[in-house]
UniProtKB/Swiss-Prot annotation:
Signal peptide: none annotated. One of its GO terms (molecular function) is NAD binding. The lineage of its organism: Bacteria, Pseudomonadati, Pseudomonadota, Gammaproteobacteria, Legionellales. Homodimer. The gene is pdxB. This is Erythronate-4-phosphate dehydrogenase. The active site is at R205, E231, H248. It catalyses: 4-phospho-D-erythronate + NAD(+) = (R)-3-hydroxy-2-oxo-4-phosphooxybutanoate + NADH + H(+). It is an enzyme of class 1 (oxidoreductase). One of its GO terms (cellular component) is cytosol. InterPro entries: D-isomer_2-hydroxyacid_DH, D-isomer_2_OHA_DH_cat_dom, D-isomer_DH_CS, D-isomer_DH_CS1, D-isomer_DH_NAD-bd, Erythronate-4-P_DHase, NAD(P)-bd_dom_sf. It comes from Legionella pneumophila (strain Lens). Its EC number is 1.1.1.290.
Length: 350
């Protein structure tokens, strides 16, 4: 079976041994020519999967090595009987680390007013964030009405409850499905009711927050974001407005990238009735001593202000966004730096 895969994905050789043959693409404009006689397209969330890309090809499977699937035109793929494989949950730990790093920076700058936190979206990422904040004894408001309809043991708070929070963590999937669409969920009416000094950390998708409404709100609300409308052609006004702004890398730890490929590989092998291969894993980093506080430990591993300043000072914002995202490849999950005793001491770290 012939696979065309994004060259930036790690561990492809071990994840797809014979009978698979892997060809790599480095840029999206290489795909139309390389896709001939391929059975599987293995991509990342940066590639739009639709009829324009695939209409002249006869592939059988689209596999995305990412949790999010809003870059995929599902109706088109279904109309062509093309199977879809995703890697949901692959980067949940990495995104939770990112949120903690943002909180570490904000707390160090004395910008966090209290310990009441709202989490929007309780999928695998939101649940990871919840577990850490709960272990660190934050007061939590959990907003996920669709989850409440599926899981009778879960009770969602209301949007009004979120207005009392000191900070909000956004982890919902982007969709427009009634009765609880996430598209433009955080709009002008919601934003203007937040208490002054409230912090929003968006590590989901740009379209959940109405960027125009945010821009017209003034500076009372602090905005920290990893995601934007129209990536990579992001709005320079949002970058200027944001306290922290990073190039969509929250889920880009080395462990998350390897896990994404492994999850896709397992699903494809299972689909074809093949035994699982041995998967490559990233080399473990050196251990850190826990003789500092949680803020310094988190920021010693990843400090979001560095990429924030790179974006804010960029001449060509789109180019800087893509370059920074591509070069973000040395971060490990926080838990790989500590033993279990250190994690018990500082539960926000893992």
């Amino acid at each position: 079976m012939n696979i065309l895969a994004d060259a930036l994905l790690p561990g492809l050789d071990s994840a797809f041994p014979p009978p698979f043959t892997v060809t790599l693409y480095h840029k999206a404009d290489e795909i139309p020519e390389l896709l001939h006689h391929k059975d599987v397209l293995l991509c990342r969330s940066t590639l739009k999967i639709n009829g324009d890309l695939l209409k002249h090809h006869q592939i059988k499977v689209v596999a995305t090595a990412t949790s999010g699937t809003d870059h995929i035109d599902f109706p088109f793929l279904e109309s062509q009987n093309i199977s879809i494989i995703d890697a949901k949950g692959c980067n949940a730990t990495s995104v939770a680390d990112y949120v903690v790093a943002c909180l570490a920076y904000l707390d160090k700058q004395q910008l966090i007013q209290g310990k009441t936190a709202g989490i929007i979206g309780l999928g695998q990422v939101g649940t990871k964030v919840y577990e850490r904040l709960n272990a660190a004894e934050f007061q939590l408001c959990l907003y996920d009405p669709p989850k409440a309809t599926r899981d009778t043991s879960f009770q969602s708070c209301s949007l009004e409850d979120l207005l009392e929070c000191d900070f909000l963590c956004v982890h919902a999937e982007l969709h427009s499905n009634a009765p609880y669409p996430s598209l433009n969920l955080i709009n002008r009416d919601f934003l203007k009711e937040l208490k002054p000094g409230c912090i929003i950390i968006n590590a989901s998708r740009g379209g959940i927050i109405n960027e125009e409404a945010l821009l017209h709100l003034g500076s009372a609300i602090l905005y920290c974001t990893d995601v934007y409308n129209n990536e990579p052609h992001i709005d320079n006004r949002i970058v200027s407005r944001a306290t922290l702004c990073t190039p969509h890398i929250a889920g880009h730890s080395l462990e998350a990238k390897f896990a994404a490929v492994a999850i896709v590989s397992r699903k494809l092998h299972q689909m074809l009735g093949l035994p699982y291969p041995q998967f490559a894993t990233p080399e473990k980093p050196y251990r850190l001593n826990d003789d500092s506080n949680w803020r310094e430990l988190a920021l010693s591993i990843y400090n979001p202000i560095h990429e924030t300043l790179e974006l804010k000072h960029a001449g060509n914002l789109s180019s800087a966004f893509l370059t920074l995202r591509k070069n973000h490849h040395h971060r490990h999950d926080f838990t790989t730096y500590f033993d279990s005793d250190s994690i018990k001491k500082y539960p926000l770290l893992g």
